[in-house]
């Protein structure tokens, strides 16, 4: 792995080069487009196409990147954002020890190791911050993502039945968590 000022140079399992780097406030629009593309697939994100405008989502993302209690990593290839991971931490005393992880990867960059690298980056940040837990929610039929999370040490905590409505159908949410103190060093 080569560390550059703009991030860590990586190679996908299919040989394509990409870079892992911290998110920048200027990534807001590119990340909003990535989310819109994945949202249009209709399977992986809870919001429906058109539910959020690109400018408002770009603004919200920029604010998260600036916030001290969140972390955004970006996967970039040929100048395009092809994936990201976000960890946000609530400021409330009761939950300030927990980071909530969300991840999004462009369809043509899945299954090449980017998800594993993004999750590992989130785990490193959680350790540095002294978090006791990373949690996430995933649709139970997203077997590919679940396999990545389990390989990275996440465990299944439960299922919230009929948690989300999507295209007039109700979908369950699988809750997963990773505990740094219980994890072996990766």
Each language-model region and where it sits:
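A short beta-loop-alpha structural element at the N-terminal edge
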Residues: 19-33
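Short glycine/proline-centered loop/turn elements that form peptide/ligand docking sites
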Residues: 115, 119, 141-145, 162-167
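Acetyl-CoA-dependent GNAT
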Residues: 3-4, 25, 49-108, 119-121, ...
């Amino acid at each position: 792995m080569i560390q550059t000022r703009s991030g860590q140079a990586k190679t996908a399992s299919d040989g394509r080069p990409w870079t892992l780097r911290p998110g920048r406030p200027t990534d807001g629009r590119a990340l909003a487009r990535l989310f819109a593309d994945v949202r249009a697939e209709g399977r992986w994100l809870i919001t429906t196409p058109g539910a959020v405008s690109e400018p408002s989502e770009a603004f919200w993302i920029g604010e998260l990147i600036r916030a001290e209690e969140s972390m955004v990593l970006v996967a970039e290839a040929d100048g395009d954002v092809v994936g990201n991971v976000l960890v946000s931490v609530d400021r409330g005393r009761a939950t300030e020890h927990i980071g909530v992880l969300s991840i999004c990867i462009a369809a043509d960059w899945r299954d090449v190791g980017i998800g594993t690298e993004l999750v590992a980056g989130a785990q490193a940040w959680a350790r540095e911050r002294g978090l006791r837990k990373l949690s996430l929610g995933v649709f139970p039929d997203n077997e590919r993502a679940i396999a990545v999370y389990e390989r990275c040490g996440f465990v299944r905590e439960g299922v919230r039945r009929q948690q989300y409505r999507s295209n007039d159908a109700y979908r369950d949410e699988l809750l997963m968590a990773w505990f740094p103190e219980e994890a072996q060093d990766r």
